[in-house]
From Swiss-Prot:
Record's catalysed reaction(s): a quinone + NADH + 5 H(+)(in) = a quinol + NAD(+) + 4 H(+)(out)
UniProt lineage: Bacteria, Pseudomonadati, Pseudomonadota, Alphaproteobacteria, Maricaulales
Annotated transmembrane regions: 12-32, 41-61, 80-100, 105-125, 130-150, 165-185, 204-224, 237-257, 275-295, 300-320, 326-346, 372-392, 406-428, 450-470
Subcellular location: Cell inner membrane
Family indicated by similarity: Belongs to the complex I subunit 2 family.
GO molecular function: NADH dehydrogenase (ubiquinone) activity; NADH:ubiquinone reductase (non-electrogenic) activity; quinone binding
Matches recorded under PANTHER family: NADH DEHYDROGENASE
UniProt keywords, alphabetically: Cell inner membrane, Cell membrane, Membrane, NAD, Quinone, Translocase, Transmembrane, Transmembrane helix, Transport, Ubiquinone
Gene Ontology cellular component terms for the protein in this record: plasma membrane
The name this protein goes by in its record: NADH-quinone oxidoreductase subunit N
Amino acid sequence: MTADMLSHDLSLLIPELVLAGGAMALLMLGVFLKGDGTEKLVQWLTVGLLAAAALAALFLVSGEGMAFNDSFVFDSLARFSKTAIGLVAAIAMLLAMPYLQAEKLGKIEYPVLVVLAVTGMMMMVSANDLIAMYMGIELQSLALYVLAAFNRDSLRASEAGLKYFVLGALSSGLLLYGASLVYGFAGSTGFGDIALAVESGSNIGLTVGLVFVICGLAFKVSAAPFHMWTPDVYEGAPTPVTAFFATAPKFAAIVLLARVLMEPFGAVVDQWRDVIWMIAVLSMAVGAFGALTQQNIKRLMAYSSISNMGYALVAVAAASQTGLWALLVFMVLYMVGAIGSFATILSMRTREGMVEQISDLAGLAQRNPGLGWSMTALMFSIGGLPFMVGFFGKFFVIYAAVQADLMILAVLAVLFSVVGAAYYLRIVKVIWFDSSEIEFVPSAVSTYWIARIAGLATVLLLPVLGWLVFRAYSVGLALL
């Protein structure tokens, strides 16, 4: 490899290099710089590092191309995804800082693990090879396993981390087995070579391998029936970790799944569409009905996440330009709702500690009108109620399904959305019409304003929704 080639390859991976180098620097800074303010300094530097990586993906990387023997690709999809992942991870880190201080968990390892996880996510959305894909997934997963059990004094957190690790190892095994089958029958791990092998004729080995790969990736997006870990991990993990789990990793995994299906296996849509179709329906059903009986708001958000990944898979099943841009718009709007909802949950702290029951939201509109209005708007948006930005996210997904002649899937998506609205409205009812004697202590300024801004964004984003759709449409147009 010549110096020019190496320079070209590295220039396409500037965001990953910024994060990887930054993680090592933060680790050394935390070890060698002793003092009371070291943890807070590392946390603030992490926020800046994540934002810098997002901006680097948006502005610094010029052009598009392949890197390192076509193992990684930087295209419009990678640019869009890395920007979104970096920004939402920075916001999640801002949410975590007051919590870590209050719970005496302000160790330097937390921000370093977040940076390493985001590095893996950015590798995932740029993967153009099965080995590169697996490297990104494992870098992300190994960091997330530790984050889930970060509060070692909590039995629930330790249990969550263990469950996540065991089931994650199982999903990695499925993914590796599928990848080995694909490699064996295609003769290559590169997406381009796999696409040529797929186009040359039907091969049952490639199809079986793809099914295993889909199962492994379905675990990463917590799609049914590979969702078993989600409610327990969401409930047991520290709340800011749950907020992180619900946003950036889901975005990275669903984009990777879409890339794998639409690029190397784009010629055999009819062979994998039915699998995605079934997983989407199961996810929407499990999420909608599972959430109806939940009393813990973090478990409810877990089922909400499962359901929303079902809607995202509806867009993937469309396997079209419309499906791809609808997927990106839906996921961005979902992340706005999810991060705002968890900011509100983090604002509900009494003198004894965090509260997590839905009943604890009672009377929130009277005790704290700002948070009450924000949570109401966020629930309406995630539920897809009309005139909120979340409604348009679901509308575009269903439109993509209709355009792809998936009429039954579109109808089921509408029906499950109606069922899902019930548990979002239940939360709104508790906020506005129930009463409670619980007194919350004032929340951190950053947490409070993230909740407020996210709530306002569910309405204020409507004027810029056209710009977001245009950007996502440009990505779909360039790729398919």
